[in-house]
Amino acid sequence: MAQINRKLYSSMYGITTGDIVTLGDTNLKIQVEKDYTTYGEECVFGGGKVIRDGMGQASGFCDEEVLDMVITNALIIDYKGIYKADIGIKNGKIKGIGKAGNPHIQPGVSPTLIIGTITEVVSGEGRILTAGAIDTHVHYISPQQADEALASGITTFVGGGTGPATGTYATTCTPGWYLRKMMEATDNIPINFGFLGKGNSSKSKALEGQIKAGALGLKLHEDWGSTPSVIDTSLKVADEYDVQICIHTDSINECGYIEDTLCAIDGRTIHAYHVEGAGGGHAPDIMKACEYANILPSSTTPTNPYSLNTIDEHLDMLMVCHHLDFNNPEDISFAQSRIRQQTIGAEDFLHDMGAISIFTSDSQAMGRIGEVICRTWQIASRMKEIRGFLSEDQMTGNDNYRVRRYIAKYTINAALAHGLSHIVGSVEKGKLADLVLWRPEFFGTKPDIVIKGGMIAYAQMGDPNASIPTPEPYISRPMYGAFGNAASATSCLFISEASIEAIKGYGLNKMLTVVKGCRVISKNDLKLNNYMPCIDIDSKTFEVSIDGVLISVKPAKKLPLAQLYNLF
């Protein structure tokens, strides 16, 4: 076989086994673990290239046997590994991962990855491919959030709200009549949606009604009263209908302390929002929720990573979002009780240890939806700066394990927590083709292409009046997959099983997808993020110790993936 040096090979066919890539301007380096393509048989498209009739493109197969789209020679980053492969898409789902091409003349072509006459090609050479991100803490305040989310690589929303109502500013609940109306309003938005009903009731009737109307779960929030009776009632209903409960606990400990909340939960599975330094929940020790197997912990973008500006911006944000008054001393005290630099600093460490399992936005309610992905990688880079290599990476000289841990936070673990993992959350055969392609130098900030259900929905695109696609302004723009009936036909509406018949009468176009296994999941099932440390928080000084080690960290003065990437 003819020889070719690595630099030339990577420029033609993408990097291969053993090659190292730096992610953006972070300090994170990944190394290709395996290449599933075949050397000398790589499929590339273009003038004089391989994917032509009788060469890499096969003839004589019926439409059902060949791919609708192939992504060639991409570097996949997923919770399972970091590897190179071709990815095949058929009928909006991932058909196969491996070696694509023409089996008549090429060795090693997977029977599920045949390139034929009807196959479209997206070149993955020199690109990183990830699963679309899942944000499980979205306040549905404005529909324009979808544009920001898609442009950043998010393809699935779980949350609640009714628009810019006072209740939605503070809580992620879509109650009652609004469930159907919000499903109708979002039907042509090219994002998978799931709606949380309002769970704050000590009686079950209203909760059951919302689940039967389509809620995929229920949200408990302190602003509506997260009392022990409310917690117990909602969990009983959730166990009956196999849906998830999300909880924002009692910051001022009015109805009880964290021990009382844990007693009310009574070992049952629950998704705990804001297991963090300043987002709300039992002050100052909500982080202790990370110690328990039945609690699925998540945190949000406002506090991560801990930097010079984190504390300063929090007070104003909190006052606005939770309908508080600067002229009311009690309101000021309420806000200040939630903002603790010691716990904010410790939050990054808990993420790096895999103790906080999921990362979310808290969109327009103190968080920024377009920053879920970039802040995830800012935390990872900052923690490597402070803590060095993870023990799992020390012998390899790369950051593969750390990168897999962090990507799991906004993909597979978010999906597992809400019963979505059978259809989204990873790059796996049979799942919806919600995929994001990145140039390595822009990884985490500006996706090249966002594929939604097998169709390109967003992409970096130049002046539409230009002679080629690349002249400035070269920015993220909606593509054909974001318009018309295609937007709904390539997206899911996640619902409870109890609501199927009711929702069939709503006249929606999105794919109705039932959530599964919400009540049997535990933190032990969450990928690469299931550590349950011993956490002690001093009630007077707010100092945090993790497994007996005092956490003391100064705020970051500079972060990667920040202003440098947003100059133009």
Curated annotation (Swiss-Prot):
GO terms for molecular function: nickel cation binding; urease activity. It catalyses: urea + 2 H2O + H(+) = hydrogencarbonate + 2 NH4(+). Pfam families: Amidohydro_1, Urease_alpha. It is found in: Cytoplasm. PROSITE patterns: UREASE_1 (PS01120), UREASE_3 (PS51368). Ni(2+) 2 binds at K219, H248, H274. Binds 2 nickel ions per subunit. Its cofactor is Ni cation. GO terms for biological process: urea catabolic process. Carboxylation allows a single lysine to coordinate two nickel ions. It is an enzyme of class 3 (hydrolase). The modification N6-carboxylysine is found at K219. Ni(2+) 1 binds at H137, H139, K219, D362. GO terms for cellular component: cytoplasm. Pathway: Nitrogen metabolism; urea degradation; CO(2) and NH(3) from urea (urease route): step 1/1. Residues 132-568 form the Urease domain. Keywords: Cytoplasm, Hydrolase, Metal-binding, Nickel. Belongs to the metallo-dependent hydrolases superfamily. Urease alpha subunit family. This is Urease subunit alpha.
